[in-house]
Amino acid sequence: MSLFNTNAYLPVVIQPHELNLDLMDNIKKAVINKYLHKETSGFMAKKIQIVEDTPMPLAELVNNEIVVHVTCNIDYKYYKVGDIVSGILTITDESDISVVCSDLICKIRSDSGTVSYDNSKYCFIKNGKVYANESTVTVMLKEAQSGMESSFVFLGNIIEK
């Protein structure tokens, strides 16, 4: 996992009825709802601070909605291939094996090990080591996938500690 900070203009949509005395509050809510803790293009905004002491570019009227470009200071988080993370092993069937972390889902290919059934629950066997369903495992991220709204998605392999 890596972090970086940048200033950027984030476009948000404001409805005409939101153009009132609470305009800045409505803009803040729109920015937070659209960008905070949402994965887009491999990055997730973990902290957003709206910069209020700079001029804001002119808004655009698009299909009866107002598009405002808001100046923000953003802390972004991202994962890259080769990162090592820990999470909970989740096995729903022989072909659906994943490791769930706080904001990342790592899919494990079934051909990298064997799914078996032990003590009335699924387990994953790799190189003779048994990993029980819902146990904590360590994975190495191998390939980025298209993410879900609030989670990064990667293919990966379980590694031994």
UniProtKB/Swiss-Prot annotation:
It is found in: Virion. Its EC number is 2.7.7.6. Pfam families: Pox_RNA_pol. It catalyses: RNA(n) + a ribonucleoside 5'-triphosphate = RNA(n+1) + diphosphate. The DNA-dependent RNA polymerase used for intermediate and late genes expression consists of eight subunits 147 kDa, 133 kDa, 35 kDa, 30 kDa, 22 kDa, 19 kDa, 18 kDa and 7 kDa totalling more than 500 kDa in mass. The same holoenzyme, with the addition of the transcription-specificity factor RAP94, is used for early gene expression. The gene is RPO18. Part of the DNA-dependent RNA polymerase which catalyzes the transcription of viral DNA into RNA using the four ribonucleoside triphosphates as substrates. Responsible for the transcription of early, intermediate and late genes. DNA-dependent RNA polymerase associates with the early transcription factor (ETF) thereby allowing the early genes transcription. Late transcription, and probably also intermediate transcription, require newly synthesized RNA polymerase. One of its GO terms (molecular function) is DNA binding. Belongs to the poxviridae DNA-directed RNA polymerase 18 kDa subunit family. Induction: Expressed in the early phase of the viral replicative cycle. The keyword Magnesium does not apply. GO terms for biological process: viral transcription. GO terms for cellular component: DNA-directed RNA polymerase complex; virion component. Keywords: DNA-directed RNA polymerase, Early protein, Nucleotidyltransferase, Transcription, Transferase, Virion. This is DNA-directed RNA polymerase 18 kDa subunit. Its main location: virion.
